[in-house]
């Protein structure tokens, strides 16, 4: 009899515990849905912060400002509000005001590295061969041509920087700043692409071509850099020489009136600190100057390897625009 009573008592306690647990899980689930966090968000968020969040969520659900995106994070990370020098709000989240600059248009555009060694000649003719299908496909559609060029040109800096980063970690040594310089180059090329996306609206088959070309080129350049960094940097230097030529032809078409000289995209005006009222021609000018700087950096990097030295032994041209 006593054993039966103890069992029934234990069952009642267990049922009560299950009921309480269910109630608590419901409350926790409600808090999780409201605050976007977990159990810990209840214990770490201050009451005032919770009230602010509740107001924001309430306004959003009530059809307040539909453009305002309310992102609630348990980690307490809030994007900082950035303003320009004139006090207006900075609207780009892909780059910051301190990452902008004025392009050096005085750079020598005619510089050329004559191919003398076998590797130089192989790099030179590889670029020439790659240019032929581009000429056939895009012809004089220089906006789309620039878009394709930049999807390829943004790869070498990322590949080289990634491999140098891994090498630095393996050998427990500094990279001489080259890791940062090459990633800056890749980021700069990516901004070229973001700019020309505003000018040339790619068709579906051009987007498909970009995916194919980028996939092939990334892996080919990765393998090429592993085998011979001097060849990889030299090839990209020649590719940038071709880019300068392409943008020069782009400017000629703009001057002839064959391509409409539309207003410069807002992203280009902020990134290159262009004056208000700038046009597409101004954008092409600064992009061409960027390509000339990348040409110099990569030929310089190849020369360092040709001298039997490593990149870290020479100071990297960080911020060289």
UniProtKB/Swiss-Prot annotation:
Organism per entry: Glycine max
Transmembrane segments: 146-166, 208-228
Catalysis: reaction(s): 2 a ubiquinol + O2 = 2 a ubiquinone + 2 H2O
Protein name, per record: Ubiquinol oxidase 1, mitochondrial
Keyword Membrane (UniProt): yes
GO molecular function terms noted in the UniProt entry: alternative oxidase activity; metal ion binding; superoxide-generating NADPH oxidase activity; ubiquinol:oxygen oxidoreductase activity
Bilayer topology annotation: Multi-pass membrane protein
Signal peptide start-end: none
Regulation: When the two monomeric subunits are covalently linked by a S-S bond, the enzyme is essentially inactive. When the disulfide bond is reduced, its component sulfhydryls can associate with K-keto acids through formation of a thiohemiacetal, resulting in enzyme activation. Pyruvate increases Vmax, but not the substrate affinity.
Function in brief: Catalyzes the cyanide-resistant oxidation of ubiquinol and the reduction of molecular oxygen to water, but does not translocate protons and consequently is not linked to oxidative phosphorylation. May increase respiration when the cytochrome respiratory pathway is restricted, or in response to low temperatures.
Xref: CDD domains: AOX
A GO cellular-component term linked to this record: mitochondrion
Major place of residence: mitochondrion
EC number, as in UniProt: 1.10.3.11
List of residues binding Fe cation 1: 150, 189, 192, 291
PANTHER family for this protein: ALTERNATIVE OXIDASE
Subcellular location(s) of the protein: Mitochondrion inner membrane
Binding site for Fe cation 2: 189, 240, 291, 294
